[in-house]
């Protein structure tokens, strides 16, 4: 009688799954962490709610109300979750039948769309972006049959550019009555004029992902939001865990979204954008850098001569960047989070010392 291992008992798609390689999972012994698009310094909060013997609210009112006020929408159009990553998964669980429906996304882009779908057993379809990293609308149209959720990251991670708003409108018209379009706006605080939040009334099938991990400087909190019309939110509420946010997380999130918290976030954005422009200008003068791409975010994508050697050389010096070589159309590319001036200088000095 053959022995069945524990791994044999697991679902086939889980056995075959390659987990998402987060910056933390990839590790490294760095002291300059520029690989996860985090804010470079800690922001301090004091806990005010100490009733930890009670379960938290499923959707903490102060957090929902504050976020709705900030985003300019109704509280009924907001769902809070454990990071935007949970929102990605909830949308698939609510709308996609495993083994029947598909999601669609446009690489090069964020890796969690595919991981979430594969974990649940939902087909992934890809339509690579055009040479300028804008949407291939004809390609998307050709592959929409059976697709229930389309993910579009704007500004896009890792390329840093915004998706053309007219293309978003065309996509929303193509998918009307067929699929949910998800605009991943994790980095929208760095270019707030480009948000699609004002489009929700016009498009009942639009959902928007947001996070406190980037401009709000709270990656360690794991707090994200899905903005959508009430009908979509009610469906997501059916599949979300009963207590997604712990009491301390809800406490700090509500403070971060207070009027003072919003002012502080906007000050951080101004500072990061100034630092980004400084770093872009410096990178353009460095011999081993072939190309620096425009960015609307808190990171910069650049193409390097001998990028793998450059990546390893900086890694060995404790400067951890994010290698994008395996992404479609990004051979030779590394992504650099915008950090402090001292961190920028470490990167610039290390790159200048590279022999090309």
Curated annotation (Swiss-Prot):
It catalyses: L-histidinol phosphate + 2-oxoglutarate = 3-(imidazol-4-yl)-2-oxopropyl phosphate + L-glutamate. Keywords: Amino-acid biosynthesis, Aminotransferase, Histidine biosynthesis, Pyridoxal phosphate, Transferase. One of its GO terms (biological process) is L-histidine biosynthetic process. Its cofactor is pyridoxal 5'-phosphate. The modification N6-(pyridoxal phosphate)lysine is found at residue 214. The keyword Amino-acid biosynthesis applies. GO terms for molecular function: histidinol-phosphate transaminase activity; pyridoxal phosphate binding. NCBIfam families: hisC. Homodimer. This is Histidinol-phosphate aminotransferase. It comes from Escherichia coli O7:K1 (strain IAI39 / ExPEC). The gene is hisC.
């Amino acid at each position: 009688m053959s022995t069945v291992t524990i791994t044999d008992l697991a679902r086939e798609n889980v056995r075959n799954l390659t987990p998402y390689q987060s910056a933390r999972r990839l590790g490294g012994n760095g002291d300059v962490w520029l690989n996860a698009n985090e804010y470079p310094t800690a922001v301090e909060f004091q806990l005010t709610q100490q009733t930890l013997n009670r379960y938290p609210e499923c959707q903490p009112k102060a957090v929902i109300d504050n976020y709705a006020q900030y985003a300019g929408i109704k509280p009924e159009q907001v769902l809070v979750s454990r990071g935007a990553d949970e929102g990605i998964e909830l949308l698939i669980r609510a709308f996609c039948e495993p083994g029947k429906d598909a999601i669609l996304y446009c690489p090069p882009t964020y890796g969690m769309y595919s991981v979430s779908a594969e974990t649940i057993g939902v087909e992934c379809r890809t339509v690579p972006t055009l040479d300028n990293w804008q949407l291939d609308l004809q390609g998307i149209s050709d592959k929409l049959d059976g697709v229930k959720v389309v993910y579009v990251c704007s500004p896009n991670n890792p390329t840093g550019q915004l998706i053309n708003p007219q293309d978003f409108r065309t996509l929303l018209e193509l998918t009307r009555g067929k699929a949910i379009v998800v605009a991943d706006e994790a980095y929208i605080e760095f270019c707030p004029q480009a948000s699609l939040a004002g489009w929700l009334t016009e498009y009942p099938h639009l959902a928007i992902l947001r996070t406190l991990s980037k401009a709000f400087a709270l990656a360690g909190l794991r707090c994200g939001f899905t903005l959508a019309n009430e009908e979509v939110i009610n469906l997501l509420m059916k599949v979300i865990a009963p207590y997604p946010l712990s009491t301390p997380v809800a406490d700090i999130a509500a403070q971060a979204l207070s009027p003072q918290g919003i002012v502080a976030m906007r000050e951080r954005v101004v500072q990061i954008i100034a630092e980004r422009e400084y770093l872009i200008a410096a990178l353009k003068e460095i011999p081993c850098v072939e190309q620096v791409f425009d960015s609307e975010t808190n990171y910069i994508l650049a193409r390097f001569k001998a990028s793998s050697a450059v990546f390893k050389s900086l890694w060995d010096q404790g400067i951890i960047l994010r290698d994008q070589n395996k992404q479609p159309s990004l051979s030779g590319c590394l992504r650099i989070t915008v950090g402090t001036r001292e961190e920028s200088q470490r990167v610039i000095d290390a790159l200048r010392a590279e022999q090309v």
